[in-house]
Amino acid sequence: MSMLHPPRFALQAREGNHLRLASATGAAIELFVLEEDIVRVLVLPDGELRGPATWSIAPGTDDTPFDGRDRRDLGGFALPPFELQVDADTLRLETGKIRLSVALAGGHCAWAIRQGGQWRAVLSDRATQAYNFGFWDAQVYHYVRREPGEMYFGLGERAGELDRARQRYEMRNIDAMGYSARTTDPLYKHIPFYLTWQPEAAAGFGLFYDTLADCSFDMGRELDNYHGPYRYFAAQHGDLDYYFIASPDTPLDAVRRFTWLTGRPAWMPRWGLGYSGSTMTYTDAPNAQERMGEFIERCREHDILCDSFHLSSGYTSIGPKRYVFNWNRDKFPDARGFVDGYLERGIRLCANIKPCLLRDHPAFAEADKAGLLVRDAHGEPAWVQFWDEVGAYLDFTNPDTVAWWKAHVKHALLDYGIAATWNDNNEFEVWTPDAFAQGFGKPYPVREAKVLQTQLMMRASRDAQREHAPSARPFLVSRSGGVGMQRYVQTWSGDNTTSWETLRYNIRMGLGLALSGVSNIGHDIGGFAGPAPSPELLVRWVACGVFMPRFSIHSWNDDATVNEPWMYPQATGQIAALIKLRYRLIPYLYELLWQSTQAYEPVLRPTFADFPADRRCYAACDDMMLGASLLVAPVVEAGQTRREVYLPAGARWVSYWSGEAFEGGQAVTLPAPWDEPVMLVREGGVIALNVAEQHFDRRGDRRGFLVVPVRGAGVAAGGCIEDDGETEAWRQGEQGRWRVQAVSDAHTVTLSVTQEGRMPARADTVELFLPAGEARQVLAPQARVLEQAVAGGWRRFTLQLPR
């Protein structure tokens, strides 16, 4: 098709909320009015779908069909009524929140969202060649106008600044070991969603491109005088299939709705929030079982709380190579006894598994003969480089492969008592052009959907765990992944390198993931690759990591050292104290993960997400919100003993450590000892705590709450979810909730604490902590005050609760 004669469209058909525009050239555009705030556009240069089904779309549900969801399936959407007008030049549709105008000459789209009762224009396709109707090649393009002052957030796991403006990114998942958290691209994950935000207008929208193909985003790095300012999306294969999500009031609107659109985050066991030990060194050692036993002894010696250990792939070695599902009996002469020893101490094992079989793997011939591998055009295995050997990937679009994988996960791991799978090295780096996958009976070139293999691998692992222990909540970890990975796994930012720069930019990387629907995240504390961290860097990294949902110290240091809590005797006490702080905060973190599962709330977020009207919150910084009530300001530079932090306007903030209150809208400088990370509670906030004394051999769980009453008249409210922490009984309603309120007026603060639902154990007492500077009379009419005390800037009330 020539650019001289772009297609002219006319409304061809309407079936409910699905409209099809067709042209004489054969090109078509399909529109789907899915929700008041979500409209989808599908551009088909040849009038037909090129790409496979979708595994991304699971609106408000736990999953998609294993073999994918039909791209025209409207199940799960509200399909609201909408207004439609068509004249000679334009098709216009309008919901309560979105107005879309499509120019019939060329199909260019212009979008507006309703804000404050008025329509605000927020996005327009580029006036020149916004789409590729066969003008250049077979790739997919979408060019849109770039407006002054726009900021762009999301795109999943990306290096550099949180604002993606003026940068270019590639989604081509690779094993980027030792990456720079400031500059390296691409990385491990494929999440083609981003949020556009206009700070001046405090309005924005999300765009999600539903593609499994390698793709790229240019956010204004490229300039071309013939087209004006623009940004664009490009994919090597498939269709231009995108979702527009209105976000008129806060950036969180689009984030929540994108997470809802792509599936409910998994509700994982509570123990997944504890400290998880990890290193490659132990399992690489000839006496691996002995080294693993020493880890438990050191935890006991130094009173390091621990709930799990990531078992690196050295347990599968034959010589220097790794062979998935193979136990090295020389390193682990008593594998069952080894696992039992960990379980007796309350530490679960999360075993590393990889989806590639080396050519000399003991099971390679079996898998090859059964047709379980990705193949080339000649029917031979599609050979790839995998670590220091050649191998072939398993094909998870073949049901026989899935069955084989699940059987091996159960037999080689779960039957031994292994609690979880660590799905690693699963970027599926298949570069052979003619490699193909079975595609559930519809073979396709692997390069068109590599990340699909990653998603199906983690799902197969999850299903194996469910089948093995139907009553237990599965816990899984995956390094690579794509849209919807939150339905299955916890993840981390891969094999980072040891440096202060990594500590700083991993924070921003994690926030980018959280703004892309993936909240159960963390980073390798101390750095995976490179030299050993200094004592100061290690402690600061731990002090930052205690606020991440995934909390693991991991390493493969160049100098053969091991990142461990006790690697520096002068810092061990501070690290142990920080880990105990982590366990004190677990009830709050558990509640935040519940809100992620139920309300699609990001656990971590930049301050501007909660304070979009405060322009100072948009400046690049190292601060973050943990939920809506806790502001965290990690130290990311050597030698700092104090930390300046900007407090968002519109609220007062109270130091966790001193109880001192500060007005918002200003920067303050606070003490930052190694073992006291800077954290402030928002006015009106309630932070759930475990106030029991904790030791390695003696755990406890007793609930307390930090409460910051509203100044003047108002209500501080919060609480936390309570269940058994491990089983699926919550699905049958076996769950309770603490609710805490502090109702304030000029003279009094009235406290209310209730336990609702099916609490796993009803408490007789609870501790509430109010700032020591709270001078108003404190009342608790529904409870009896057993004790009052002031310590550390907080006034503690021990309440006896009614039965």
Model-identified regions with their sequence ranges:
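Generic detector of short, aliphatic-rich beta-strand segments that form the cores of beta-sheets
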Residues: V678-V681, R803
